[in-house]
Amino acid sequence: MDPNATTPIPHPPELASTAEKRLIEAENGEPAAKRVRLDEDGGENARDSAVKGDAANGQEHITPAASEIKPDNRVKGQAPIKAEYLVEVIHNNGRDARDEGPDDDAAEGRTASEPSGKVARKGKKGQNQARDFGRSADSIRLCNSRMLSDEFSPKHCSFGDRCNLSHDLRKYLAEGRRPDLETFGGKCPIFEVHGWCNAGWKCLFVRSHMEEVEREDGRKELVLLRDLTRSKKPEGEASEDGPYGVVNTVASVDKHRMGRSKVDLSRSVEYSKWMDQYTNLVKQLHNARVDEKKREEELGELRATFVEPPFKPSEKRRLYFGRETPVLAPLTTQGNLPFRRLCVDLGAQGTYSEMAMAKPIVQGQQSEWALMKAHESETRPPTLSPETLASNSPIVKVYDNSRDLRFGAQISASSHPLAIKAAECLTTFLPHLRLIDLNCGCPIDMIYKAGAGSALLEQHNKIERIIRGMNAVSGEVPITCKLRIGVKENHPLAKKNIERAVFGSPDFRNQLGAPGCAAITLHGRTRQQRYKKPADWGYIAECAALIQSYRDKRDELTDTVREPDASTLAPSSEVFFLGNGDCYSHADYYKAIDESHVDTVMIGRGALIKPWVFEEIAAGQYLDKSSTERLGYIERFCRYGMEAWGADEMGIGTTRRFLLEYLSFAYRYVPIGLLERLPPAINDRPPAYRGRDDLETLMASDNYRDWIKISEMFLGPAHEGFKFQPKHKSNSYEMEAEG
């Protein structure tokens, strides 16, 4: 198998002219990605002694002088890069900035093992708290009544003479905004695809879809162009007031009704009250059993007070997780709509929203409901082979692929009343929802201290009540949950939590059956554990065996109590089990399935570093992506970002911000062709190195200024009010001096 083989992808025609020509070199002539100071003894002679190769391929591979090459000591935790690509990078503090590897806990928030008051460690370590991204806005604010209207036919402004925004279109275009961007050939990417632009006059490419028309009376009018013949009929909602092809948009009036408690959630309230009563009854039964003085008659009286739940759960839509369905993990900040859309393009068969909190969902807060938006590509069924669909497997026989989709929502909640209400709200207002996932693993301090996320790991009874209640009100939408091994190291809790989520406690199960959890994902780490330690796939394998034992004994369990009810069982009477942690290649993926016996693998950081990991899984081989191909993915993200957030000043600022968040992971990718041995490990950090061309070197930079330069290849110069602070301080360099 050729490790350098790659699957061809379409490249933007303007890529070479707009991106590669914008590659910026540093003042000393070295690639901007590396602030290289050559060894004092070698000076310029060290550079002269470098050997240039691969001239025939148009690439410049630089080999350091013999004195610069260090012995191959195979350092644990360090990526094994070929000697000819290594360089020496010395910063003012006399150490390599890469000596401190990136702290992936920064992506999830400070954990309890770190102090919440004074910062324990200062300088370049740790994460930047309360990051400021500045503000990208026009100097003159154009009224929305003018934004999408031609000059002589504006919409009515509800504020009238009291409006403090500009209604003078020509003044706005001349003085109130930056000049049009020159990237993408000066043509609006949204207009080129859809035939109209929902940013209207605020678009930073507006010159490409406007014209001045002379009317019969001699007046000249500025008009917006529309060419709806360019666009295909969307599967999702499309309007000139919102993103094209985006589904799960909730009307403002509905969110306002939620905020005023005007939405009917009586089913949730009724079920929560019943569950509180039944939980109290279970406690009394338990106390009666342990009290030897209680007579059997009293136990019988307590059992007689049992009341059936007010309603039964609806039968759920069938799910399928298997070898062909790698799943993108729910990712805070990075798991935005454009990135998920990119991963679906590259082969992700399942996606999740960023984690939303139950209480703001119930209150109708815009920030949480915005996380529920999905692209129409996420509403398509997972791609399965004809052999799988024709299988005689009992799971596949009851699975309807045409009714399935890829996008699921993830929520966190600290109590069953909140979780039940949130589940009812989501299933009421979101028509495109594969499943609702309960987060029982988030390590963020704020979530943990509120009793949600990983705090639930120590409260297995609460996990069962939440899943049982959500399952009761979610209609046909299945309920799943995501766990960690536990809270503290050497104190695993996952097996107990899986037992409660799948089987239920004996008291509940005897009367109500199983809770109805359709799938469980286990992240192979504890809350306390750092990302520098590998995920525990051995423990995941033990939990997979527990799930299999449930499958084997399911009929035995249900037959001893009552005839199983389809509404109390997981879809297809199966509980799928997903593993999560350190999956970085097709080799990791298939090893997890074959050796740990999970149904499929959920991929998080691996997809952030190289989104084409899904392509590798489908191809069954490593793909050595060139710098041009990788830049094509960045361009695609920018296009998707502008479609989602707009091509105006604010939308491009938002796209730039989330692109930089993506690049804060993507720079860590070490091309396969530069490695001495395979497989690559996700926690291996590379020493300073040069790429096979200048663009590849730039993409490997851990300096956030270089990430901004990459963003400017497609989004133009950053607005003067734009700011960016990386999550991890080691990427910031001189940020303290900048204030």
UniProtKB/Swiss-Prot annotation:
| This protein's record includes keyword Protein transport | no
One GO MF annotation is: mRNA dihydrouridine synthase activity
Q: Where is this region: Disordered?
A: 1-77, 92-133
Q: What class of enzyme is it?
A: oxidoreductase
Basic and acidic residues bias located where?
A: 32-51
Q: What's the chief localization of this chain?
A: cytoplasm
- Name the UniProt key words of this record, in alphabetical order: Cytoplasm, Flavoprotein, FMN, Metal-binding, mRNA processing, NAD, NADP, Nucleus, Oxidoreductase, Repeat, tRNA processing, Zinc, Zinc-finger
What compartments host this protein?
Answer: Cytoplasm; Nucleus
Biological process annotations from GO? mRNA processing
Enumerate the residue ranges forming zinc fingers (C3H1-type).
Answer: 137-170, 187-212
Swiss-Prot/TrEMBL cofactor(s): FMN
**Any single Gene Ontology cellular-component annotation:** nuclear periphery
Alphabetized SUPFAM superfamilies for the sequence: FMN-linked oxidoreductases
Q: Which Gene3D superfamilies match?
A: Aldolase class I
InterPro entries noted in UniProt: Aldolase_TIM, DUS-like_FMN-bd, tRNA_hU_synthase_CS, Znf_CCCH
- Which annotated residues bind FMN? 330-332, 410, 482, 523, 580-582, 604-605
UniProt catalytic activity: 5,6-dihydrouridine(47) in tRNA + NAD(+) = uridine(47) in tRNA + NADH + H(+); 5,6-dihydrouridine(47) in tRNA + NADP(+) = uridine(47) in tRNA + NADPH + H(+); a 5,6-dihydrouridine in mRNA + NAD(+) = a uridine in mRNA + NADH + H(+); a 5,6-dihydrouridine in mRNA + NADP(+) = a uridine in mRNA + NADPH + H(+)
- Which Enzyme Commission number(s) are listed? 1.3.1.89, 1.3.1.-
Catalytic residues of the enzyme: 442 (proton donor)
- Give the family per the record: Belongs to the Dus family. Dus3 subfamily.
Q: What does this protein do?
A: Catalyzes the synthesis of dihydrouridine, a modified base found in the D-loop of most tRNAs. Specifically modifies U47 in cytoplasmic tRNAs. Catalyzes the synthesis of dihydrouridine in some mRNAs, thereby affecting their translation.
Supply the name of the protein: tRNA-dihydrouridine(47) synthase [NAD(P)(+)]
The lineage is:
Eukaryota, Fungi, Dikarya, Ascomycota, Pezizomycotina
Which gene codes for it? DUS3
